[in-house]
Amino acid sequence: MTLTKMLEELPRHCDICAKKSSKGHQQYWRGYKLHLDVADGQIPISAVLTSASVHDSQVAIPLATLTAQRVTSLYDVMDSAYDAQEILEHSRGLGHVPIVDPAHRGRKTKNVIVPGKQPRQLTWAEEKRFQERTMIERVNGRLKDEFGGRFVRVRGAVKVMAHLMFGVLVLTVDQRMRLSE
């Protein structure tokens, strides 16, 4: 499937989404979600805007394909939301090494007399590289707090994307200036 077709299939209408916070409370928001792919140095490379209810894993393959067309990278570092075989295979198909935090589905460990298959764990080298993933959290935080991404007061996906991309542009310039110091 082509990149254009993959991006066209992603919903871009305004809707409502909910998730459970780390403290167990439901959080709700209405609108859109900006998915970013970030390189070393906290430089945004690719961005895709979708409906708020789109799960991050649905955007992983188009976003990785878009980024692969723009830069040469060695690793795809992702959190446990992206722990799916299709995403890992696509990353390898692009010539990247996927480093994904293993998903802990079911959350509770069961005591069994006969041990089954051990859950996948990151190697020490993968854990070291995975620490770089906190970079995207800092980029998202700066985009929201410093560059107007928290409250966008326009309607329509095109206008929202334009406002967010102005923030991403300024964030990129600011980050490049920090790196050159």
Residue ranges and their predicted role:
Residues 51, 105-106, 158:
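Residue-level detector of flexible, active-site-proximal loop/helix-junction positions
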Residues 151-181:
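Charge-patterned, long linear interaction tracts outside catalytic cores
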Residues 1-93:
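Polybasic low-complexity intrinsically disordered regions
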